[in-house]
Amino acid sequence: MNQTAGPELARSRRLLTGYFAGLGVVMAVWGARMPAVQNTAELSTAGLALVLLAAALGMVAGLQTGGRLARPACLPTLLTGGAIALAVCLAVLGVCRSLESLLVAAFVFGAAHGVLDVAVNAAAVRCQDAHGRPIMGRLHASFSLGGLTGAALTSATAHTPHTVLFAGVAATAATAAGAATRLTRCLASPGLEPVHNRVAPGLDERGGLSRPRLWLLGTLAAGTLLGEGAAADWAAVHLHDLGATAATSAVAYGVYSAAMAAGRLAGDRLTARFGAPAVVRAGAALAALGLATGLAGSTIAFALLGWAAFGLGLSVTIPSLITAAGIGGPRAVATVAVTGYVGLLAGPALIGAVATVIALPHALLLPALLAAAVAALAPKALEKPTP
């Protein structure tokens, strides 16, 4: 890193930290107030499922579009435009009163989320390359901390109409994105060029990721995000089935999220010292063993420890996979993200279907088994680049 790039690099890192945190807040507020959206629009369970499907389809479209557009010169526009569009859509979702309007708004919301997701991760890869050391974990930790902040905000405003909350969060996010417009230009600066050109095992003759390695990264992302989806949708149910109160059950996902944030904050130093393959392998093994142990126990304390170990163990996986995909450029990042979100979206439903046949703790062994698979395959997927 040259001296002239230092200030630009610091500004870029702070800016991306804010973007990741803001995205975490928006998504947490939207998810936590979804029941209010359902009640206000008088949606059936099937209707809500259609709204979520529209958001998912929009996100896939946004990820693909963002992957095509996320060149360095376009990053400032994609970040500012994506953030403002996401904020406006959140406010619109708050005032929708029919299934039809919600479907349209949810699709555009998902598309804006997808574009912003690719742009912020592509910018993070670029910033990390220029930095010459791992910073992806801390950036993703800010998303986790933003999610916790959003959850706390939602809890504190439980008696506030969701329309008012959505409008307030949207106005804050849009104002912040607009105010940071000039700052985003530093992300396209030549000062953020990589400190070295990386040629990794698994690159094709054109310098991009080979298809087998790209799909391996995507498959590991899907397995990891299936586990994240399971924690979000089933951790509280698991504790409730063990006899926990509603308040204690709600703590389960908070424990998981806090452990993941802590792991990501420490993950960069561990990755710099031991390398991504070793750290991801050890973390995924901890996740598999911890969750399996928590499921085997019959006490609430065991279950909470299990979910904490699961979050801590998986914390470094997605940042490391995004970093590895970044070698192939924004389209590779988008491909891994799209594949990963298949696991996030389909996983909870799959676990629910399995739980209708066998006990829920047995069904929740699926994320533990997938974490074990991540531990086994991480060294191959995350081979260290060689000059």
Placement of each model-derived feature along the sequence:
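Intracellular juxtamembrane helix-capping segments at the cytosolic ends
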Residues: 115-130, 315-328
